[in-house]
């Protein structure tokens, strides 16, 4: 009796292994590429809530500078975030909203229209104050998905310390003497003498509060970690009783003459170079008509779990390169920027692995044995994805949208 049971189990085991060696489909690269291209066509239209591409209109001779500025800022921000995630081995959140977000850029109002800078006599040595007028977006307060504060750190060759830890605070409206006057948001360690760079902070909660309560919009404060002492970021050492001034300089906030030596010609040249680097907010909003659809038919997506990936085997599951040229591959002329992008796709066989990391695949194979009508073999699917920013026209109106999960970065068997 025991021998029969053991034999039956071994037969079931062998059948299961044989079945699990099959993949979702035979590896036909041309077929995969054609399907991926058509999927991208539908994906873009779906995310924009369009049933068909916008009508072709003559492309504008010149795109307004402010539109290009928003597009460039959004694109650069996404690239920076992707680089940080890669360095920290992090992944894009799997609960990313499906539909495209509209992107709005709000520049910091100039202190002085002619210079957009604070004169040296107006300096606060330990902090800077930055304010934004977001009143135009109040009617869309409930549609806010993300808000980023971006400020360009300038090179300061005269800095007395090579690096500082700067902190961003939301300035609060004090109700009484015991109420807090600021709320911590984030901090960054910056190299004061190094080449300039953009700094980005997630300020979604603060901007959301401003949109709902206008009187609470008192701006942001860029401050030192410990102005009453000297903080050394390299070893987290604090030198007491030694006040430290803010040595980091910011475009659009600090006067050029305080960090630039030379004649007026040099100073004017530096100001011109930094003229497009005003501190600004990038707001990403889900339009109302997309928001309603999102609430009634919310898409649930699989979490990006760690899985076995066959990167170095030609026939097995791995990332395959695919560049999409909007005009050539999709026949579209209505997307102005970019002209195309590296969409990539996942393809290849998923051999069966008897390990603790692939229990999901094992269950699927056993289920397939019991229910052969079901398609339950492990498939090669995308694991890490990144968003894409596009600039397009509907008629003569330019629109900038962020499309989530458009660029495949890695694959897994599932």
UniProtKB/Swiss-Prot annotation:
InterPro entries: Cystine-knot_cytokine, TGF-b_C, TGF-b_propeptide, TGF-beta, TGF-beta-rel, TGFb2, TGFb_CS. One of its GO terms (biological process) is positive regulation of neuron apoptotic process. Transmembrane segments: none annotated. Glycans are attached at residues 72, 140, 241. This is Transforming growth factor beta-2 proprotein. Keywords: Aortic aneurysm, Chromosomal rearrangement, Cleavage on pair of basic residues, Disease variant, Disulfide bond, Extracellular matrix, Glycoprotein, Growth factor, Mitogen, Secreted, Signal. PANTHER family: TGF-BETA FAMILY, TRANSFORMING GROWTH FACTOR BETA-2 PROPROTEIN. Belongs to the TGF-beta family. SUPFAM superfamilies: Cystine-knot cytokines. It is linked to A chromosomal aberration involving TGFB2 is found in a family with Peters anomaly. Translocation t(1;7)(q41;p21) with HDAC9. One of its GO terms (molecular function) is type III transforming growth factor beta receptor binding. Disulfide bonds join 309-318, 317-380, 346-411, 350-413. Residues 1-20 form the signal peptide. It comes from the Eukaryota. One of its GO terms (cellular component) is platelet alpha granule lumen. Pfam families: TGF_beta, TGFb_propeptide.
């Amino acid at each position: 009796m025991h021998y029969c049971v053991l034999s039956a189990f071994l037969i079931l085991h062998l059948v299961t292994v044989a079945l699990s060696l099959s993949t979702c489909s035979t590896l036909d690269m041309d077929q995969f590429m054609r399907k991926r291209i058509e999927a991208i066509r539908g994906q873009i239209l779906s995310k924009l809530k369009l049933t068909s591409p916008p009508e072709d209109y003559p492309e504008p001779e010149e795109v307004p500078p402010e539109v290009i500025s928003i597009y460039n800022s959004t694109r650069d921000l996404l690239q920076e975030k992707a680089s940080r995630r890669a360095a920290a081995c992090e992944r894009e959140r799997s609960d990313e909203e499906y539909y495209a977000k509209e992107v709005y850029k709000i520049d910091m109002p100039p202190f002085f229209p002619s210079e957009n800078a604070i004169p040296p006599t107006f300096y606060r040595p330990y902090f800077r104050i930055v304010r934004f007028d977001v009143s135009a977006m109040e009617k869309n307060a409930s549609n806010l998905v993300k808000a980023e504060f971006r400020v360009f750190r300038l090179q300061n060759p005269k800095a007395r310390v090579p690096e500082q830890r700067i902190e961003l605070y939301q300035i609060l409206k004090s109700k009484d003497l015991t109420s807090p006057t600021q709320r911590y948001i984030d901090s960054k360690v910056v190299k004061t003498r190094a080449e300039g760079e953009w700094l980005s902070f997630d300020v979604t909660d603060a901007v959301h509060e401003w949109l709902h309560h206008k009187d609470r919009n008192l701006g942001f404060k860029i401050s030192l970690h410990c102005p009453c002492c000297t903080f050394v970021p390299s070893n987290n050492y604090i030198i007491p009783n030694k006040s430290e001034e803010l040595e980091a300089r910011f475009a659009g906030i600090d006067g050029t003459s305080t960090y630039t030596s030379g004649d007026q010609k040099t100073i004017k040249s530096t100001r011109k170079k930094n003229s497009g680097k005003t501190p600004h907010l990038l707001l990403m909003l889900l339009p109302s008509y997309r928001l309603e659809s999102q609430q009634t038919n919310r898409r649930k997506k699989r979490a990006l779990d760690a899985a076995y990936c066959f990167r170095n085997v030609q026939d097995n599951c791995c990332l395959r390169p695919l560049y999409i040229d909007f005009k050539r591959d999709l026949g579209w002329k209505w997307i102005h920027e970019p002209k195309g992008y590296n969409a990539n796709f996942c393809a290849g066989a998923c051999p069966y692995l008897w390990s603790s990391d692939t229990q999901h695949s094992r269950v699927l194979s056993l289920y397939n044995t019991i229910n052969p009508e079901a398609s339950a073999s492990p498939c090669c699917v995308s694991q890490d994805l990144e968003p894409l920013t596009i600039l397009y026209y509907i008629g003569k109106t330019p629109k900038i949208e962020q499309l989530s999960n458009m660029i495949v970065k890695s694959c897994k068997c599932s």
